[in-house]
Amino acid sequence: MTDTPQNPTADLPIKVTARNVTVSYSGKQALHDVSIDIPDRSVTAFIGPSGCGKSTFLRCLNRMNDTIDGAVVGGSLTIDGQEINDKTIDPVVLRASVGMVFQKPNPFPKSIYDNVAYGPRIHGLALTRPELDEIVENALRKAGLWNEVSDRLNHPGTGLSGGQQQRLVIARAIAVNPEVILMDEPCSALDPIATARIEELIDELRENYCIIIVTHSMQQAARVSQHTAFFHMGNLVEYGPTEDIFTNPRDTRTQDYITGRFG
């Protein structure tokens, strides 16, 4: 239980603030009083065994739990000081500013161009075709994909390799100017070479975005993140600079997890 916030990031601007966040599904509590401050322009990793609550908390950040029957979310959750669970907040607009990248690449059954252009079209971010072209190119460049696909933008996104598809999905998220990018096991379906490219991309993107990644790979958390939060049985057990979590954990449960005593 973390009813006082864990904040090892006092020297960094805070992007996401959670206070006593709870989640239950059909009356069964899945997350217990999570309080945390997550900094901007950095990568924060959520680690822990299966069913520990890390993905449940991640889904709170763009209100994906709203889509689950029987889900009840409590507590306060703000992005840049704005309470995202306020009933006046349109979840569709929220999900544009809080992008989501899932475990399995999920490009739309559209062309590469239309995959990236989809969000800007819906949200009216481009008034002309040249403006839309620029948004698409910029997003693909930021995702490290432009040089690989610039000559075949009309080809299906589903025809790309797994790693390219995942970068296309990241470009799709970037195209609508998000504040936060959520990644739920983004490399679990990829081979080691594609995983390394995604990890390089994450490191590049953190210069401009708040990135939060759920991963079962402690090695990946150590490689890509600046801060790490360890969840266990629906509780946020420990949160701190990644190096401290892995080399000098304060809680014995964290120590036991990272040394492989359970998982």
Curated annotation (Swiss-Prot):
GO molecular function, one term: ATP hydrolysis activity
Keywords, in A-Z order: ATP-binding, Cell inner membrane, Cell membrane, Membrane, Nucleotide-binding, Phosphate transport, Translocase, Transport
EC number: 7.3.2.1
Designated gene of the protein: pstB
Reactions mediated catalytically: phosphate(out) + ATP + H2O = ADP + 2 phosphate(in) + H(+)
Reported function: Part of the ABC transporter complex PstSACB involved in phosphate import. Responsible for energy coupling to the transport system.
Domain of life: Bacteria
KW Amino-acid biosynthesis (keyword) present: no
Descriptive protein name: Phosphate import ATP-binding protein PstB
One GO cellular component, as annotated: plasma membrane
Pfam families per UniProt: ABC_tran
ABC transporter domain segment(s): 16-258
Source organism of this protein record: Maricaulis maris (strain MCS10) (Caulobacter maris)
